[in-house]
Amino acid sequence: MKEINELKFYDKMANWDFSQIKYKEQNKTNWDFYKKIKENTNEKSLCLDLGTGGGENVLKHYPNVGMIIATDFSKEMIKTAKENYKNYPNKNIKFTLMNNLEMTFPKEIFDLISARHTIINAKQIYECLVDGGTLVIRGVDQKDCWEIKELFGRGQAYKDEMPISEKDYLDLKEAGFTKIEKVQILHNEYYKTEDDLMALLLKTPILDDYSEIKNEDFVHKPIIEEEKFNEYVTKYKIEKGILLKRVYYGIIAKK
């Protein structure tokens, strides 16, 4: 089950900051998570950000709204977020500990709920949104980093029969959302050195062999086989850097 696996992994992460990893980005799809949030909010909107992690993204990129409640199920993440908040004293935001699957807010309170690379409970989100409220999701899809997953023969959601993007879509439809837009987001990353790419793979669950759908035990595997890694680097190293093809999905759902 996606929920169990992600809880086990992210609860161990005290910092989700990749600033030390050197890479360049190339967006191939015109769909920006924070622009979509801005398009669906105003300066009075009450927003909920699920799975906020260490707060780096919500603090830097969230638009100017009335108030942001930012939650995460990891105590270490929330601790980090509160430390990062000290650098943004004018941001109207509150960080609080909460499991996305057991939301503790009143019904029909939020104008917008955002969820970036995290688990969701579609029914509870629907209940917490005001009529006409918006849900904005950006997630990691099954085909993300597919070339390196195929080379290693394993990876996050590698063997799943249904992409997590489709599961989220169906869950939202069942919860009661009537207007749902889902898009595939293609994004290239070019890592400056082998060490930069290795740092990413060691820190993230990209090559962890677990299901996003099934209820399976999950242990983060911080070991990358050198021979296969070198084979990938040889094949995908170009002038811009070492190419990693990212595949995400975006969803906008209206209540």
Q: Across the structure, where does each feature detected by a protein language model lie?
A:
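A short glycine-rich, Lys/Arg-flanked "PGG" loop and its adjoining helix->strand segment in the class I
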Residues: 122-136
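A short SAM/SAH-binding and catalytic strip from SAM-dependent methyltransferases
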Residues: 110-124, 139-141
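Conserved Class I S-adenosyl-L-methionine
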Residues: 181-255
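Short alpha-helix
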Residues: 161-176
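Conserved class I S-adenosyl-L-methionine
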Residues: 1-41
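A short acidic, Gly/Pro-enriched loop at the edge of an enzyme's catalytic core
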Residues: 101-112
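Short, glycine-/aromatic-enriched active-site segment of Class I SAM-dependent methyltransferases
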Residues: 141-159
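Class I SAM-dependent methyltransferase SAM/SAH-binding core
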Residues: 46-102
